[in-house]
Amino acid sequence: MDIEKAVLEILLRKIRYERVSIHFSDTLSDYRDVSKRCFLQAARNLADSAEDENEQLYNWAREALERQEGIYGCILEVAQKILKIKGGYICYDIRNWSEDSQFLHWKEISSSLGQDIFMAAILANNNPGKEEISTYLCMPFPKIDFEDFDKLLGKDGHVGLAENHFHLKGSFPVFMLNWTCLMNHIGDGNDFFHRFKEYREVEILIEHEDMNRNDIFYSSICAAAYRLHLYEIYSGVPQELQMPFSYDRDIDEVDLRVLQDRIEYYRGQLEEKWDYAKGQREKGLDYALAELWDVCYDKAEVSIVGERYFLYRCFNAIFEKDTRFRYEEKNLFYKYLLIFFRIRSEMVQTNPMRGFKNFQIYQDRKEDIIDYYPEYQKHVIRLVGCSLRRWQNISTLEMRLSPKTTADETISRIKEFDRDIGKSGSEELGNDYFYVLHFPKEKETGIVELKPRNYILREKMAKQIEEQKRLIDLEMNDLKYWGRIPRVRGYDTCSGEIGCRPEVFAQFYRAIQAYAKRNQANWVHWTYHVGEDFLDLTDGLRAIDETIHFCELPQNSRLGHGMALGINAKKYYKMKNYKILLSRQDLMDNIAWVLGFSSEHGIVIPVDLSGYLKKYFSKLLKNVYVDNVKEYKKEESDSGVDQEQAIAQVAATIVSIDLSEEKEEWQLYYDAWKLRGDRPELYLEDEQPEMSDIYDGALRGGIEEARKNKTCRAYYKSYHFSNSVREKGAILEILDIRDDYIELVQKLQEELMGILTVKQIGIECNPTSNFKIGPFNRFEQHPMLRMYGKNLYKYSNRMNISINTDDMGIFQTSLEMEYVTMYVALLKSKDENGKAR
């Protein structure tokens, strides 16, 4: 389906809606004939496609549009290749999973365009009854219809799937709920697109440099007007009662009030139906749901069924050749879909850009529109807690959410979520459904005198130590006196790793672990997002090691993502052209860690490589620490001390080799690195922090020798509190990557995986999320297959891993789909010799 995918992406995502004419035009496109110039211009953005090939693609597209109901026939044709209706459900129609590669093609198409239009098209072509329609439209995704998967996916009485990495606010149908809200409140005067500072559709931005937020808002007004007009037509509203609508003039903001009044009129009719059915009055969510209200009002999916029903009715009118849907209405629906997909591409990750920052932009927009409307916000939890569990056999669901400022506020919020899901209390939820609190990482904002790195976040987490102690106390009381099962079962971190090392959270993790252990709160467990986003593979591995040691993760903890463990080092550094650009500080830390970790774990480094790394380290150390005594020089000068003598004293204090220990400079620096889990303020004085200073996990155990060493303490103090060290350390350097260094990195990966296996620390893998963010481009290259790759790779391990979704609303996936994706990818994969595995 590569050809179909390319054509549909061009016709639905790359064509501007202004270039589609409602009336017949020789120069513009319509639903059954796209202009050649427009098509070829859009096709230039296709990877690995020459101009002649694009011409062929255009000819194929034109033939496809002519032999069917234009673009709508093309959509149906793709839907029929992968979907079927069976047993009252929409199912994947894959007859031979071991030979048929259609599923992975479908995954690419549905990631780009979603599944809603394809499900609506195949339904419209089958024209089911009203009761069946409501069931079909409530399905968040097609069902897997393959007997061999029944046991794996927990069907027919088998144990279900565990969802161990599930961000609550990133897992609802992000676009559909926001779009429904927008189409029903377009005229309310809210700044719906306040976070849309930049467009994610890069190719469109290049082509239309004058685009701005007003453009995307204006197109939304047009879509809302098109939607209402088409709704009135297929609903049979007499023309004299329809909202005034002209095919011959542009819609503008002057029409907004009239448009919103009419929308509210139809929503009001929905509210009357609710009043009649339930004896109470609530706001209608979507006027387009009108005909299905009596069979959908009590469904968890009621908030998004209206838009799906609208799509279904339009497709049905076209396929059934409804005379009310003329040429003009078909073009109007095409224009609507173009705007629909244009805005969808700004809320669901569809672009090919990798890295966590790209994903984070989408993540930050996920509630931009519904933020203004509490009645839609409460359906986020219903969609996540009820709908997704209803359509998948999930045995346990760990829902991650960010805590509020205080423990009482957090508990109150959780109780509200439980009520929104439709449960009366925690007793009914049992052990299979609970919350994990995740704390967002934050980059440091700059250097502040006498403040450590990331001081703002450190101060927040210091306050959270007390709040989470109180939360544990509250849950213990509920369990002891009321028998209520604790709702918060674990702690995690989230958001981007770059610029926020595990050391920032170390004190919090140690303090809460100790408190939970003292109070026998054995339901509290630990995980940490790490090794997902990194500027160098070695940097990602060091972060994993820092998490293990600084946070002192206990047995049966987990790491979120951990991709650095299993990434193919050769392919990674080849992709980077064998050059790494990092700050001096990070490079210095990485080299010292590579040397120190290898020494401690018996990994032999070739003499030539060892010399290369030590020489590079010495250069960095001199540039950042030895030569950076200007601020000390000024301080000593002001106090009347001889400047040269002062410089010599400070340099000796900071970087001199402790001859009594006969250690090299990198060894002392590596020992100082081990102190980074300690509370930085304890090192402001030159005195050694004593064990009596340990409070709330301020000092970690097992590193007393490094703590005693004056040179190590000076390194650590300068790392945090020396302005010149931090400024010089931020300067960027290029490291050339050698073949023997790559081989060393592979050994470091293997050793770390072995350590985690022995410690029984598992990895929460997220196939689609990792594929979108990580540095690999095929699912069979997923790092999990080295973490647990029995009979697959020479250097694979037997770690505890789980498959999860991460942010399924942004990545357009499901837990079943993640399992099937990896299954099919493995069936299609080849070994180094090109043979099937």
PLM regions: where:
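Metal-cofactor-binding active-site regions of metalloenzymes
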Residues: 1-837
